[in-house]
Design a protein with these regions (language model features):
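Hydrophobic/aromatic-rich core segments of domains that either
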Residues: 112-129, 138-151, 157, 162-229
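Secondary-structure boundary elements
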Residues: 1-156
């Protein structure tokens, strides 16, 4: 299925209307979606070596990386440590794979005393790179059979807020930038809900943003009425 998606995206790479591409992806996923794949609980397949590798990698980013040193242990466990971002995510070495995504742009921050340890500035630069690379198109309609293979997923021209939020969370954590997902299941005045990211800045502020689409520090959905809690 993933190879078929890659082939479709390559064949339609010159198509300027991404919604035409979306319709083709939806049709393709429906065709493959008739094939049911078994779901297995993590506890039955996850290995000690996989968990140890994940813990070691996250711990090095926390203690030795430039953008997570301000986290206490509780925040580290929530914002950086988790071995996966979403359900059905392949249990592979995603941190190492995604760490190579535009690393040179982040390295530039090391030359500025004000920004070299700024999780906020690192997040802005990385999110800008994601936007430039993916050219996101927000849609409420998700494809029937999701794409989880990273080299294919980063090529998709459309996605839901949750799709882009999960992508951003994974890429940010791979670089040692502390980020989580948040959501509201239902808007107060219309159908559907919304998902977004939250970055824990070096000054302790929790800054909402839309992964791939809008940066931390920018106004986020100020025109939307919030439901009562």
């Amino acid at each position: 299925y993933y190879d078929a998606v890659d082939s479709l995206l390559t064949a339609m790479k010159d198509t300027t209307d991404k919604w035409v591409v979306r319709d083709s992806l939806v049709a393709l996923s429906r065709r493959f979606g008739q094939v049911l794949t078994p779901k297995v609980q993590d506890v039955k397949i996850v290995t000690a070596d996989f968990l140890i590798q994940n813990i070691d990698s996250a711990f090095v980013q926390w203690r030795e990386g430039p953008w997570a040193r301000h986290l206490d242990f509780e925040d580290f466990c929530e914002y950086l440590l988790p071995y996966k971002v979403e359900e059905l995510q392949p249990l592979d070495d995603w941190r190492t794979h995604l760490r190579s995504f535009h690393p040179d742009h982040l390295d530039e921050l090391a030359y500025c005393d004000l920004y070299r340890n700024s999780a906020l500035q690192a997040g802005i630069k990385l999110n800008d790179n994601l936007w430039y690379y993916m050219k996101p198109g927000i849609t409420d309609e998700t494809i029937q059979l999701p794409v989880y293979r990273w080299r294919t997923r980063l090529r998709l021209p459309i996605g839901t807020c949750a799709d882009y939020g999960n992508i951003a969370t994974s890429v940010f954590r791979s670089q040692g930038i502390p980020v989580v997902m948040d959501f509201t299941p239902q808007w107060a005045f219309r159908s559907l809900g919304h998902s977004w990211n939250v970055l824990l800045a070096e000054d302790g502020k929790r800054m909402p943003f839309s992964g791939v689409c809008s940066n931390p520090g920018q106004p986020h959905k100020l025109g939307e009425r919030m439901p009562k809690v």
